[in-house]
Each structure stands twice: as C-alpha cells, then as structure tokens.
Curated annotation (Swiss-Prot):
Name of this protein: Ribosome maturation factor RimP
The keyword Cytoplasm belongs to this UniProt entry's keyword annotation: yes
InterPro entries reported in the protein's UniProt record: Ribosome_maturation_RimP (IPR003728), RimP_C (IPR028998), RimP_C_sf (IPR036847), RimP_N (IPR028989), RimP_N_sf (IPR035956)
SUPFAM superfamilies for this protein: YhbC-like, C-terminal domain (SSF74942), YhbC-like, N-terminal domain (SSF75420)
Domain of life: Bacteria
Length: 154
C-alpha cells in the first residue's frame, strides 16, 4: 500500500493493481488531484520501459474497471504515464530500490521548521527513511511525506 495515500487513493490502488499487473506492468502509484476538473494519474512501469501504446492499453483496461466500480463521484480525467526521470516515490520499497539516489521531499508537517528537503536516500527502516542532507542524516516518517520525487541529473 502506498505511503500517505488518501482513502480514495488506497481504494483505487486496490481496485486497479490486478488489471494493470495482468497486462504485464507494474503499478508504480496513483495520484488523485482534486480541482475544477479532477485528475486521476496512474504511473506504470515495466522492465522494457513504457511507450504510448502501453499507456493506452492500461488506460482502456482501467477505464473499464472504473466504469463498472464507479468509485469517483466527481468528473475527472484519467492520465496514464511512465514515472519519468523525476519518478514519484509512493512506497517504502521505492525508497529502498533507489537507495543512494537523490530525492526531493515535501512533508505534511514541518521538521525543523522545514517542509521541503532534498538529499540522498541513505536507508529505509520500516516506516522511516534516512536522507543525507548537506552531509547530515535526517530521519523522516514515511507517513509524513506528502510528495517525493527522484531528482534527475543530466
């Protein structure tokens, strides 16, 4: 289950994981962004990478599931994409997989009067991650992370 997901996002994740995996893809995570027209964003990946046809296949399958289950009570757009270079991080496994990489974090509640942090993922221990920020190790509860993305280097 994703870290810090809303109840709706948890329900949607449970609902669409099997159909996405049945098509041969990994469900990296989802985001539901509320607005005038809300957006359900689904991130998928595979060992061979993701192309537009892959996204279309998943979109078609997920749309069919969502049409039957109808879990979202407002109008929304469905977007399916690869995680990209600035890959979002949703689970403890994601942090462990990208240990040693740079990550940008936005926290729900400030730590040391800061909500935004950037550093190198050093360790994952259960529901806590250690990030080295400017040479100092900082520990964050995964439940306090609102948003996290890898920082691409070119």
């Amino acid at each position: 289950m994703g870290v810090g997901l809303s109840t709706l996002e948890q329900k949607l994740t449970e609902m669409i994981t099997a159909p996405v995996e049945a098509l041969g893809y990994e469900l990296v995570g989802i985001e539901f962004i509320r607005g005038r027209t809300s957006t359900l964003r689904i991130y998928i990946d595979s060992e061979d990478g993701i192309n537009v046809d892959d996204c279309a296949d998943v979109s078609h399958q997920v749309s069919a599931v969502l049409d039957v289950e109808d879990p979202i009570s407002v109008a929304y757009n469905l977007e399916v994409s690869s995680p990209g270079l600035d890959r979002p991080m949703f689970t403890a496994d994601h942090y462990a997989r990208f240990q040693g990489e740079e990550v940008a974090l936005v926290l729900r509640m400030a730590v040391q009067n800061r909500r935004k942090w950037q550093g190198i993922i050093k360790a994952v221990d259960g529901e806590m991650i250690t990030v080295t920020v400017e040479g100092k190790d900082e520990v964050f509860a995964l439940s306090n992370i609102q948003k996290a993305n890898l920082v691409p280097h070119f």
